[in-house]
Amino acid sequence: MGEIGGNALDGIHARVRTAPLADQAAIAAVRQRDRLLTKPPGSLGRLEAIVEWLAAWQGKSPPVLESAAAVVFAGNHGVAKHGVSAYPAEVTAQMVANFEAGGAAINQIAKANGLKLSIVPIDLDRPTADIIIADAMSVQECAAAVNLGASVAAADLDLLCIGEMGIGNTTPASAILQALFGGPAHIWVGPGTGVERDALTNKIRAVESAVARVIGTDGTSPLEFLRRLGGREIAALVGAIIEARHRRIPVLIDGFVATAAAAVVHAIEPGAIDHCLIGHLSAEPAHRRAVQALGKTPILELNMRLGEASGAALAAGIVRSALAVHTGMATFAEAGVTDRQT
């Protein structure tokens, strides 16, 4: 995505609405080969659909996975000072250092699944404004974060897994989802890093206050919700999703916070996240509600709530297996196996 000048948010809207469509010829070619493989039709379930998805958005059959990556965006939040997380804000920078040293869960998962890992900290010494009383970002700050996220969608990637790190960021994610989909705050708020009882009540009140400040004002487009309620890492996730679509890169979305970013894009144009699959269903209670609102079915359900693109990176292993089956299996003719009677 080129640098967006002028009315930056309008430029981002336009970018979403001019996204390329799925390659129907590639889908048809995958289905044709699948019918010839030594198995009953449909017997590999979602693995077959995953290969069709890869082909549709890469625009080729067979699809490939020669260059796959995971990206973790990190940001800090002014609302964290209200005790909405079990951890202090300095943990964001400390975890970025841990990522860079190779000591986090995502480092191990990315390595195990053949993913190049990138960590993108965004102005950690400059938290967003406290969303209870002020807009999180200016238009320029939001657009800059979107552009930064877009820059990770390199043209040579075959698959992109995206996630985040940011103490307190399930609070802005919950606020975005409530603003987009409605309902009371408590159905969109969960424990995040492990808050409970009074701290959880405090988190719900923070989301209620933030959304009440925004709803009914002029700035209520999806990107305005992102700007006013979100965070830099969430905006970067939005940029990565949008640019990946234009570069025909299939995307695996991580958990609750990354899904909130996908929801922003979906709210602009529902088909604009068709190139995305949800890697896993988070243990964060509202994640199920969010993915249902997007019409998505997560690939995995492992009771995880870590973030860090960990669930998306694990799902990349399923995607690799699906493609290996599709490209490596013999056809009935090649194997000398009698096909089903018709």
Swiss-Prot record:
Family indicated by similarity: Belongs to the CobT family.
Pathway annotation: Nucleoside biosynthesis; alpha-ribazole biosynthesis; alpha-ribazole from 5,6-dimethylbenzimidazole: step 1/2
Enzyme class, spelled out: transferase
Superkingdom as given in the UniProt entry: Bacteria
GO molecular function, one term: nicotinate-nucleotide-dimethylbenzimidazole phosphoribosyltransferase activity
Gene Ontology biological-process annotations: cobalamin biosynthetic process
Protein name: Nicotinate-nucleotide--dimethylbenzimidazole phosphoribosyltransferase
Documented EC number(s): 2.4.2.21
Reactions this protein catalyses: 5,6-dimethylbenzimidazole + nicotinate beta-D-ribonucleotide = alpha-ribazole 5'-phosphate + nicotinate + H(+)
Functional description taken from the UniProt entry: Catalyzes the synthesis of alpha-ribazole-5'-phosphate from nicotinate mononucleotide (NAMN) and 5,6-dimethylbenzimidazole (DMB).
NCBIfam families cross-referenced by the UniProt entry: cobT_DBIPRT, PRK00105.1
Pfam families (UniProt xref): DBI_PRT
Catalytic residues of the enzyme: 308
Underlying gene: cobT
UniProt-listed PANTHER family: NICOTINATE-NUCLEOTIDE--DIMETHYLBENZIMIDAZOLE PHOSPHORIBOSYLTRANSFERASE
UniProt keyword annotations, A-Z: Cobalamin biosynthesis, Glycosyltransferase, Plasmid, Transferase
